[in-house]
Amino acid sequence: MKVFVTGATGYIGGSVSTRLLEQGHEVIGLARSAEAAVALKKRGIEPLTGDINAYTPFVEVVKRVDAVINAANSDNAFVAHALLTGLRGTGKTLIQTSGSSVVGTYDNGEASDDTFDEDTPFTPQPEKAMRVAIDHAVLAAAKENVRAIVIRPALIYGRGIGVSSTSVQLPKLIDVARKHGVPRHVGRGLNIWGHVHIEDVAALYLLALEKASAGSLFYAENGEASFKSVTQSLGRMLGMGDRTQDWPIGEAVEGLGPGAYLSFGSNSRVRAKRSRALGWQPKGRALTDEIENGVYAEVYGRK
């Protein structure tokens, strides 16, 4: 199978691309610079050099491939529109990357008992409304002969196996701990997020590519933890002990940007019911073990 991957130099897209190549698939990857094109070529990926917002190349490249994986920007409606324009009526596959933050609410570090599987309705917060609208537009394309699939990973951790090996949320918390001399969490840190290893995320993409029906939505999670427990684990890895510090939401927004509300202060407790029903069996290293004894200890731990 020939697959076009946007975000092929990124954390998710790069890891998925590596697994696709290992399974014998051909991969075309979007490269936004000459350096990115070289990096993709070195990995056996055919680079398509261009801008993420270039409409015509996206419409044209889908004619050359059997499937598309959009892992570049979950909030970019333009990209989704361009890909769907080229895919409608073809029966080809589009896997759209979303994220479990869409179910988050403004909890400011407090706990919530609410959990969500793929069938649980919810109303997104305003900053996630566009992402959910894109997800719905992709899934609706199943009625227009597109094998449309959406995957919503929880907090992803672990070493990426593509061009980019670095996760997103945890390194930001590590930077905060180093800056202030103590790990910090939004509010009391009682808010809970699901999490999933990057290798398990890549495995779900390949499984969905092989088996999923048109119109399928999948969460990706393999456990959950409060941000207080996550920051305690980071503190132990950094040699700071178990002590953590509450971070008022206003100060957290100043330090982390608006993402502090939903990426670090909300609850995102999802259940990957449909993913497991499809046959997904996550096997990645546990979150605390990866932090304290794995890649994060190797890269960020005390020397």
Question: Where in this protein do the model-derived segments appear?
Answer:
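N-terminal Rossmann NAD(P)H-binding glycine-rich loop of SDR-like oxidoreductase domains
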Residues: 3-25
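NAD(P)-cofactor binding segment of oxidoreductase domains
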Residues: 57, 61-112
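Conserved beta-loop-beta element that borders a ligand/cofactor-binding pocket
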Residues: 136-161
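Glycine/proline-rich active-site loop of Rossmann-fold NAD(P)-dependent oxidoreductases
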Residues: 158-171, 207-218
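A conserved pocket-lining segment of Rossmann-fold NAD(P)-dependent short-chain dehydrogenase/reductase
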Residues: 172-196, 204
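Conserved C-terminal active-site "lid" loop/helix of NAD(P)H-dependent oxidoreductases
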Residues: 198, 228, 254-281
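Mid/C-terminal beta-alpha module of Rossmann-like enzyme folds, strongest
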Residues: 204-259, 299-302
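Amphipathic terminal alpha-helices
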Residues: 285-303
